[in-house]
Amino acid sequence: MDNLKKQVGIKAAEFVKSGMVVGLGTGSTAAYFVEELGRRIAEEQLEITGVTTSNVTSSQARALGIPLASIDEVDYVDLTVDGADEIDSSLNGIKGGGAALLMEKIVATYSKDYIWIVDESKLSENLGSFKIPVEVIPYGSQQVFKKFEAAGYAPTWRLNEENERLITDMHHFIIDLHISQIKEPEKLAEELDLMGGVVEHGLFNNMVKKVIVAGNEGVRIINK
């Protein structure tokens, strides 16, 4: 599995050219993309500026010598590459398994181009196999949780290693929703967008036009 993730990370790095502002995703697959950019900077004199989507990715990028800037310090992001937890046949996706969904969506929204890199196990006809993370402010979060319960979304709190509520890089909580067969992700996203206390959710609808997939038969590209 790690080899598949590495293959798509290296392939995605081929789309990066000198002079670009590049959004650096978060997660085990995106880490291989960041690693390959670090290699190209060291060995090929690639010149880029990175915009990161989490504290974890910031630490990795600095260790690799990748120059960084905040999303507020650049005019735009040329290309963002990130992983995804599940992708449906229309290239809608669920992200946020690494609890970085808010920063990931902000960077993706202000990117000219956006690519997901995954292994083929992340592809499905309809979303629903993976939990949907919802980032909420602490104040009133119990009320939000109860509303999700009443809606039948089987919510659970995202916990840390100490079995306490996980606190995101932006100092929020995460409630994971367990909904099977999401046939109308746009409708669900609109519902979540309008809910008081919800900061962001892990439904990334109509945001990518290119997905790089690694499988047993090699790497392929799905274009929308």
Swiss-Prot record:
Active site: 104
Biological process (GO), any one: pentose-phosphate shunt, non-oxidative branch
Residues that bind substrate: 26-29, 82-85, 95-98, 122
Entries under Gene3D superfamilies matching the protein: 3.30.70.260, 3.40.50.1360
Transmembrane segments: none
CDD domains listed in its UniProt record: RPI_A
SUPFAM superfamilies cross-referenced by the UniProt entry: D-ribose-5-phosphate isomerase (RpiA), lid domain, NagB/RpiA/CoA transferase-like
EC code: 5.3.1.6
Enzyme class, spelled out: isomerase
Pathway of action: Carbohydrate degradation; pentose phosphate pathway; D-ribose 5-phosphate from D-ribulose 5-phosphate (non-oxidative stage): step 1/1
Pfam families in UniProt: Rib_5-P_isom_A
GO terms, molecular function: ribose-5-phosphate isomerase activity
Catalytic activity, reaction form: aldehydo-D-ribose 5-phosphate = D-ribulose 5-phosphate
Keywords: Isomerase
Family indicated by similarity: Belongs to the ribose 5-phosphate isomerase family.
Stated role: Catalyzes the reversible conversion of ribose-5-phosphate to ribulose 5-phosphate.
Subunit structure, interactors included: Homodimer.
Protein name (Swiss-Prot/TrEMBL): Ribose-5-phosphate isomerase A
Gene name tied to this protein: rpiA
